[in-house]
Amino acid sequence: MNLQEIVTKRTGKAISQCSNKELYFSLLEMTKGLAEEKGSNEGKRKLYYISAEFLIGKLLSNNLINLGIYEDVKKLLADNGKSLAEIEEVEPEPSLGNGGLGRLAACFLDSIATLGLNGDGVGLNYHYGLFKQVFENNLQHETPNPWIEKESWLTKTDRAYTIQFGGFNLQSRMYDIDVLGYNNRTTKLHLFDVETVDESLVGEGIDFDKEDIKKNLTLFLYPDDSDDKGRILRVYQQYFMVSNAARLI
């Protein structure tokens, strides 16, 4: 895929005339297309790594490196007066993980892809992650950490399941993120979301209605469990995740 062709198709401009945001989304389209061309690893058996969190970090640079085109893209941009490092700043970091468990899960997926093993990851598509820490008047405040945009590394799939709970059902939808192996094929990170999720439930800070499971299930990673409502919500999250994983497998 040719970056200039994608830029022209999207913006009608030359690379040198584009904003960093325009170039980021052009690189996103190019990288996703190249990942699709590489195809997935295959084998008689398949491994599924199921985790409540995947701390995958920003993906653009890592994917360009694993595709073997990082230096070429960097030079092309520099020749047009653009900085790849500055373009990378436009990318929001997926709010899908927080700590060691999430980083370990992400490393496993990287290894699976690079080693050419037939395996995928399964988790939840959190909209706001854990929280974003901001400081105002020397005081810490917790705010949502949104990352999902109209165009992102997420690819919506046709895979959907009806998950039964006591007294109600939830309709799930699977989204995929490609995890590129270094000079190898790709692994998929399958992320399940609730079709009825409602971001407007979130009020001041990261407060939200913990009882409305149909609308809140995938809003936050590790929602506050200092009360029974929060603890029950976490159980629902885990049940939803493993139920979808079982249906997928």
Model-derived features: where do they sit?
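A conserved ligand/cofactor-binding region detector
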Residues: 1-249
